[in-house]
Amino acid sequence: MNMTMKLNKLFSIIAISVAAVSCSDFLNLSDPNAVTTANYYTSLTDIQNSVNGVYAVLKEGNFMGSSACYFEENKARFLTFPDTGVGGGENAQFDNCTVQAGNQMVLSRWNAIYKCIDRANVVLKHIDDIKYSSADVRSQLEAEVRFVRALCYYTLVCDWGPVPVVLSKIETLDGVNKANVRQPKETVYQAIFDDCEFVVSSKLPDLQTAANCGRASKVAAEALWAKAALQMATDEDFAAKKEELCKTAITQLTAAWSKKPFGDFKNVDLEEIWDVDKQATAAEGIFQLVFIGGSNSANSSYNTQFRPTDINDPAKEVNGKASSGSHFMPFNKTTSLYNEAGDLRMSKLIARGSHKGSDTYYTLKYRDLDPSGYYGCNNVVLRYADVALMLAEAYYHSNQTAKAQEYLNMVRNRAGLPSVTPTGTALRDAIYTERWREFVYEFKAFSDMKRGYTKAEMLDLMKKDGATEYDNTDYYLPIPHTQHILNPDGLYQNPGY
């Protein structure tokens, strides 16, 4: 096996970057006709294209594409996948809390995230290969890829805990061996904080224009920084740092909130962010994955994944009697979650359907009736409802009850619900219930649950919800088997797998 093959085999971080034709081209400089990263970057367009390639990986199915729901809503039991035989039963493992180390969806997610990191590192390595008309342009490009890299590491630490941390392009077998080692969670979080801090101090705009709603901004970095700080603060392993981390989260969230392009949140249109024709300009939007309707190469699959079969028939959409798509909301779970009369999210963003004769519910968030079947609905990764509810979380975890209630009620009032004044664990439950109501089908549920509840409490919640196979093993995903066996000591397996 030659060195290049070993690099590809040993570590998915050595994924081919958008700027390189192949690993052999990258390593073999003797070919005068080879296009390598060493001679590829000659213009601003080359750098910009590579930055676009970093963003592109976010859209891969098991990363932030439509299959991302398996790792969040399905694991948290807010969605279910009815066709248990698909993928050799691997899809159903997420519903049943029986995910195995050989699960190909887990491997696909791992590979996609590290491919995205690798592409970001390639851009950072070569960003100074060209000259810029303005230092601000360079700053913005670096900030964009560092935001995406931070988003990658946030997903990794939520899903797997300790993971390899790679902050520069790896080019040798020795470099791979040294990097192919799980680093402490604290190291992963620090990488996120460092990247977000760079973005916040960069020349990026506070918020992007509608035309650039799929690009990083300072507010996006502030929100991500805060989310990572909250995730760390509520991790039992970092109890001693909880107060400090919550202060960091409040600082970043307050900064993000101060830049909001609207007045009273109650007056922000609930449906606008999900209107395929308006979501790019929606006041609530912070960062989206952008798709193009009518395009057979740049369309999104969320609509087909989460909607009834007859998605282009408005009449059937209204009466809700079409067969549900591949992921739907269990009837009893939905009615118990949206159990307050007048909740506009239930009446405007959820519709009733049926699957094999049983009543169920599905989302209208990705509604798109494009007759071509190539849908343009975006994935809204960060929005201001998230900022408000994270402020409620941060204040709750800081024992500032009144402030937590204030931000909780902003979201409730916008949804047509009255203000409430719970305290103690009832306030905690109200905040996270509100998050599940607000963000269902937005790939946040299981990570949110980890922020609100201890491992013991999660075990109790899942068991009471009927997850008979759930145990503390399921708190993290397994390290993919094909990665673990390459370095059993450095890429040690998570407990129970």
Regions found by a protein language model. Name each.
Residues M1-P32:
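Bacterial Sec-dependent N-terminal signal peptides
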Residues V86, N91-C97, S326-R383, G496:
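Flexible, polar/acidic helix-loop-strand segments at domain edges
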Residues S24-E90, L167, Y189, F193-S202, ...:
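An aromatic- and glycine-enriched ligand-binding surface/loop that stacks and positions planar moieties
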Residues Q48-N62, V86-W160, R182-Q190, C196-A211, ...:
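Conserved, well-structured interaction surfaces
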Residues S22-S24, Y55, F63, L79-T80, ...:
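Long, intrinsically disordered, low-complexity segments
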